[in-house]
Every structure is written in structure tokens, then in C-alpha cells.
């Protein structure tokens, strides 16, 4: 099995020390070259890792600057010299255009940060307006009065979030105000306190999403129905105020309250009902 070593044994037995020395130098030289090449490869690999880390950090810095610039620009665009909200139709269109542009250059965590800012600043919430100039009306408590029935938001999300990947992001308290979320990936999201009433969630992924205190409709779950385009709705009964939830993936969705569970069991359809935590026993489907 070691016959391939016979030439070496013969060389040593011959006593030809010059040949033995030459062989030793060759072996040591080859081993040294291998070691040098290995060290060079290791250094090159470490350099690649360092470059990747620096690139990632630079991208984060650039994204943070982009978001900060967007927030500053929007704030200046829709406020007057006294710091009051002033959003004429052109300014609202420009604000929506800026939002659409910035969404194309940031990752999902950046998108979530922008959505939280817009929502907490009440720029996505329909606001009560006066009927002469269309200005937002103060509520007497340092904020602007909401008007879910006939109000106008500063920014409409419309189809901006359709099919967007927001998985694993922090969307707590975001007011989506009827946005089109068809096919969006909201898996593992924290949607605590978010307002999804009137949104279109058809085909969206809510696997393991946290839905604590998340609003899917107004009124009562027994009388609430999904929104139908621009059809009239009733905030008291909930008719026409609910989210469209057909074919939503609800596997392992967390902290659903009984009202939301009832609504989802009623209006999500057979595919979604099979993924709804807690089952659907005793709640008939309205979608067949």
C-alpha cells in the first residue's frame, strides 16, 4: 500500500546526500509556497469581510440621511411660518410624490421608520377640514381633529405598499387608512395598535404577526363588513369599514382579540380560516 514511497527509500539507502538535500529543499519550498498562498488567501478574505462591513455601515448612514432629509422636507412643505399645518392640494401631491420617491431607495426597516413618523405625526389620518379653505381644524387639545367619515389626510398611501416586503419590522400604531396592502409581506411584524380598517389585505402574509389591539374594522364584529371601493360605510355598525382579508396567511398570528378573531373567521375565506389560530368553530364563513 506504500509502494509509492519506494523511490524515496531507495534514495536514502543510496547515500546520495546531494539528491536528498535537493529533494528536501524542494519539499520545504513547496510547503512554504503553500503556506504563503494560504496566508494571502486568509488576508484577502478578511479584507472582503471588512469591506462588506464598511459598505453595510455606509449604506445605513446614507439611508438615515435620506430619511432625515425626507422628514425635514415634508415638515417644511406642509407647515407655515407659525408651525401650523398648511397643506394645499399641490402640497399634498408633492408630499405623496416625495414619499413614493424615498420608498424606492430605502430598505424595509427604513420604510417602517417613515411609516411610523407619518402616522404618529397624523399625516396619514383623515382630518376634519373647514368647508371654505379646506384647512385642518384643531381639536382644542393641541392636535388636529380626526374625521373618519369625511376627513382628508395629508398623505394617502394608496398603492404604495402593494406587494411590499415589511416582514419583521416595527409598525406599532401605524394608521394605514385604507391602504392597498395586497400581497404585502407582514410576517413577524409588530402591528400592535395599528389601524388596518378599510385596508385591502387580500393575499397578504401575516404569519406570526403581533396583532395586539390591532383594528380591523369599526363597529361590531357581527355587523362589520369589508370595504367595497368608494361605497358608503357606517362607522356605527361597521358596515363597509372592515379590512379585505380574503386569502390572508394567518398562521401563528399572535394576540388576536376575540372581536378580530370573529371578523377574520367570518370574512377571510376557507384558505385563511384553515390558518387562523384558535380555529373557526361556530363562526360561519361569509365567503363560502
Residue ranges of model-derived segments:
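Membrane-proximal alpha-helical anchors
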Residues: 3-97
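Hydrophobic repeat-domain scaffold segments
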Residues: 63-168
